[in-house]
């Protein structure tokens, strides 16, 4: 690293400029990662927080994907799943977006209907017909506390039994209601028929030995299509579109960082060809020169990503109260490590030229 440190001191301006680029890209990736995680949490936290490992949807039409919006399951389907081998618990869950009013305030909320005692809702002991459990976001937007009343779409009046959790769905706070109350809210879209009243999906808790064969047999018997809880997130339309776009942007930033670092060290290596030739003529091995060049790249990347990560963390902490932003190791440290790895890969590809430098040719051309 002797030559690498001398280069860093000699060409301070060049390396400072490149380091600034790394800092800015790292900060941008860190901010985008935190924002992606925050927006995703506002989209899906109510679903990821369910004490279930699978969700059963009504079977979609040919060529269509699973969707919470289009799904509607019957009581008969729920009972078939409850009796299926390997299923420890099967509970109907209604999901719909409604308008809530209270004391002159209005807000869009997601009504989640569950059977009292099902274990799906927070503080479920307070939940029954005519009562609702509000997420903290819903209570804040409507200015409600336990014991007060709210009116949901269609004139359905409910009393706030409790305020608990920060669940949200499709960027709207969640209001937990009884399944009977939810069916009144969702009617006529989820009205009853000969097979009984409907819900949106069936939340399933399955035994350890429950496999794809068991799932396929139960799906066929009930006329449903089942997905794991994580896979079911793609059935939330806003999440699939939003998360895909943001992840694509983040991926492009990673690729750009590797290209920028690689381009810088390609030019730098070309400019140093004469110096490399002299070192080779003096007996320096190719491996030593490669380690020296890669060490130089690692120093630059480590310093740049550390500074960029610190900036992203500081900005994330500052805006966390006003925008959906998740500040943790996964959203800040992981992008920095990926940036360092990709930048090192780009630098490694660029410094390969060192292996092809012929000391006699380079020294002869220098004369």
Specify the residue positions occupied by each region the protein language model found.
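N-terminal Sec/SRP start-transfer signal
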Residues: 1-29, 40, 367
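Interfacial "coupling" helices/loops that link adjacent transmembrane helices in transporter permeases
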Residues: 260-301
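Membrane interfacial helix motifs at helix-loop boundaries and amphipathic/re-entrant anchors
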Residues: 38-49, 62-65, 167, 229-252, ...
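Mechanotransmission and gating elements of multispan inner-membrane complexes involved in transport
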Residues: 155, 164-253
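Hydrophobic secondary-structure segments that place a key small or acidic residue at a functional site
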Residues: 93-96, 101-116, 121-188
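Alpha-helical transmembrane segments of integral membrane proteins
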Residues: 18-28, 246-263, 300, 304, ...
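Short helix-loop junctions at transmembrane helix boundaries
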Residues: 291-341, 348-366
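Hydrophobic, regular-secondary-structure patches
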Residues: 26-107
């Amino acid at each position: 690293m002797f030559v690498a440190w001398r280069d860093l001191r000699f060409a301070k301006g060049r390396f400072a400029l490149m380091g600034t680029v790394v800092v800015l890209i790292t900060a941008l990736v860190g901010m985008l990662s935190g924002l992606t995680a925050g927006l995703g949490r506002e989209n899906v936290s109510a679903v990821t927080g369910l004490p279930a490992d699978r969700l059963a949807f009504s079977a979609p039409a040919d060529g269509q994907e699973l969707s919470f919006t289009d799904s509607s399951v019957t009581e008969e389907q729920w009972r078939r799943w409850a009796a299926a081998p390997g299923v420890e618990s099967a509970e109907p869950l209604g999901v719909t977006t409604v308008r809530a009013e209270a004391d002159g305030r209005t807000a869009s909320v997601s009504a989640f209907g569950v059977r009292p005692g099902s274990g799906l809702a927070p503080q479920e002991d307070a939940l029954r017909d005519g009562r609702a459990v509000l997420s903290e976001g819903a209570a804040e937007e409507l200015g409600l506390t336990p014991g007060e009343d709210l009116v949901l779409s269609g004139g359905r009046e409910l009393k706030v039994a409790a305020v608990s959790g920060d669940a949200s769905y499709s960027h709207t706070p969640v209001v937990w209601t009884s399944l009977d109350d939810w069916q009144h809210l969702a009617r006529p879209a989820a009205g009853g028929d000969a097979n009984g009243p409907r819900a949106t999906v069936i939340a399933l808790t399955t035994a350890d030995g429950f496999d794809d064969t068991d799932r396929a047999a139960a799906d066929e018997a009930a006329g449903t299509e089942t997905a794991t809880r994580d896979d079911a997130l793609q059935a939330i339309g806003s999440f699939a579109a939003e998360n895909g776009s943001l992840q694509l942007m983040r991926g492009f930033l990673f690729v750009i960082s590797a290209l920028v670092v690689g381009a810088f060290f390609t030019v730098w290596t070309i400019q140093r060809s004469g110096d490399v030739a002299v070192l080779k003529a003096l007996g320096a091995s190719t491996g030593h020169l490669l380690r020296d060049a890669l060490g130089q790249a690692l120093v630059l990347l480590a310093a740049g990503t550390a500074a960029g990560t610190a900036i992203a963390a500081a900005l994330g902490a500052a805006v966390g109260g006003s925008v959906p932003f998740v500040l943790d190791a996964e959203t800040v440290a992981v992008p920095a490590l990926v940036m360092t790895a990709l930048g090192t890969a780009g630098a490694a590809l660029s410094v390969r030229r060192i292996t092809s430098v012929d000391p006699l040719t380079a020294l002869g051309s220098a004369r």
